[in-house]
Amino acid sequence: MTKTMSNKESLEKLIFALDMGGGLDDVMSWVRRLAGHVGVFKVGKEAFTRFGPQLVQSIQETGSRVFLDLKFHDIPNTVARAAEGAVELGVAMFNVHALGGMSMMTETVESVKKMAGRRELPMPLILGVTVLTSLNDEDLQRLGFTCTTGELVLRLARMAQDAGLSGVVASAQDVEAIRAACGKDFVIVTPGIRGLARVAGDDQKRVLTAEEAVRRGSDYLVIGRPIRTAEDPVAAADDFCREIARGLSAR
């Protein structure tokens, strides 16, 4: 795909999820294969537990950016110290569970600012996880919540913004409400993105296509299986970039 300015912008919004089996060499083969076709590589619990900081550093050595998707959720001091470690790793973005509360989020923001300033490192985006895309209203009721997923997402997004976070991770179905409540500068990262055909074994319930998610206001899209299981993963990534570009044009 020719990298015009609009395509470059769409590429930077595409996050590839490195959620797969195999060894470090297998994971890095995906990074090398897709570098230049996606903007960010997401390192989640599966990959980080197996390979640790070495994986983050190996990705960065290719010139690519990293989204550290560990969803920190603990007492404020513990999360703040973990966040400082994320700054030292030089990741472009990382996340915390907004359900960890206001104190946890505000202390994390302050610690990250201090660490980045002290080490003269770039300030990463700090994202609040709202409601996992695998959960629906029935799931929340079983957990004891009396609100809908949309209501809880909006409440947590506002709390994250008040705490000073850069943005949130939220389903595309919640993007418009978040954008209206939190404004145009609040970053929204959207998982649960699928192609026109759903992936076999899909366990995410609140999903949309890339074009529709961007049209609604998503800033970054997390895509894994639809690229990884495609016959031609590079072509699939390029197709998603084109979808993103169409969504941007339709805003």
UniProtKB/Swiss-Prot annotation:
GO molecular function annotation = orotidine-5'-phosphate decarboxylase activity
Query: What UniProt keywords are attached to this protein's entry?
Result: Decarboxylase, Lyase, Pyrimidine biosynthesis
What Gene Ontology cellular-component terms does the record carry?
cytosol
The UniProt record gives the binding positions of substrate as: 19, 42, 69-78, 133, 194, 204, 224-225
Short name of one Pfam family: OMPdecase
Q: Which reaction does it catalyse?
A: orotidine 5'-phosphate + H(+) = UMP + CO2
Question: Catalytic residues?
Answer: K71
Q: Which is a GO BP term held by this UniProt record? A: 'de novo' UMP biosynthetic process
Q: What is its EC number?
A: 4.1.1.23
**Name of the top EC class for this enzyme:** lyase
Pathway listed for it? Pyrimidine metabolism; UMP biosynthesis via de novo pathway; UMP from orotate: step 2/2
Q: How does it assemble?
A: Homodimer.
Hey, which family's this protein in? Answer: Belongs to the OMP decarboxylase family. Type 1 subfamily.
The task this protein performs is described as: Catalyzes the decarboxylation of orotidine 5'-monophosphate (OMP) to uridine 5'-monophosphate (UMP).
Entries under HAMAP family matching the protein: OMPdecase_type1_B (MF_01200_B)
Q: Mind telling me which PANTHER family this protein's record contains? A: OROTIDINE 5'-PHOSPHATE DECARBOXYLASE
Name of the protein = Orotidine 5'-phosphate decarboxylase
Species name:
Syntrophus aciditrophicus (strain SB)
